[in-house]
Amino acid sequence: MKKLGIIIDSFTSITEDEFKKLEDFYFLPLQLILDGTSYEDNPSNDRQKLFDKIIQASDIKTSLPISSTIEKAVNESSQKYNDVLVLPIASFLSGTISVINVYAQKHKNVHIFDNHFVANTIVEIGLQAKKMYEQENKSIKEIITWLEEINTKTITFLSLKTLDYLVKGGRISGVKKFILTKLKLFPIIQSYTNNSIAGLKRTFKSSLEKIYNKLAEFIGGENNFKNYNLKLVHGPSKEMVDGAVEFFKQKGLEFSSIVLASTVIIAHTGPDSISISVVPKY
């Protein structure tokens, strides 16, 4: 039987126990750099300890997986499997995909799919691709076509409680930084073909209302939520998680998954942050 290998990275936010249950998956840890000290964002890390370090750090950076780790994963998987599917962090968020491509070009059976999936959605997509390839005898070309369709119909919005981490990362500067930090607004970030500001709200609840309306518009109306999985990815703020769950419950909706974000995500969004995605059911 033909076999499909999958390569993922720490943008999946996968835990150690979850990763141990996966077969034919390779993992690439992104790097977190706090005040000059580097940490690999591995599933085995104690995230809460690293969240605490992020809060205390004055200089926060992230970086690509180590090049030799990427090379080893690509080379080994290409020899072991008929085809290999790479589902990396989006190219508009990281240069990881460019480095992977350097090694993938040497192997015709390694296929990189640039996407804007978030967290456990990436793993679920990988598992479905394996099922289609190995059990349904789909070609890699058919799987890529399916991935393109799902990716196009998926969108994510983030609500952040503070702009401090965007400022530390150099993503806001000058007069704009001064105005936004003084107003204490909740920025809403849309993640699709890039990251862009989708709105600014004065309260967390109003940011959730804005996200709900944006999601409904994207899927063609409130009645279509039944055709999508609603997913929540969050930092260590229980208050924001509980608030989001209750808000969407009042709308008659439940999250199909609630996942604690990896440290490289929180390094950019801050601990008081959530992301909400719609992913079409399949």
Curated annotation (Swiss-Prot):
Segments forming domain DegV: 4-280
UniProt xrefs under Pfam families: DegV (PF02645)
GO molecular function list: lipid binding
Taxonomy, superkingdom: Bacteria
Key words of the record: Lipid-binding
InterPro entries: DegV, DegV_C, DegV_domain_contain
Residues reported to bind hexadecanoate: S63, S94
Role according to the record: May bind long-chain fatty acids, such as palmitate, and may play a role in lipid transport or fatty acid metabolism.
Name under which the protein is recorded: DegV domain-containing protein MYPU_7660
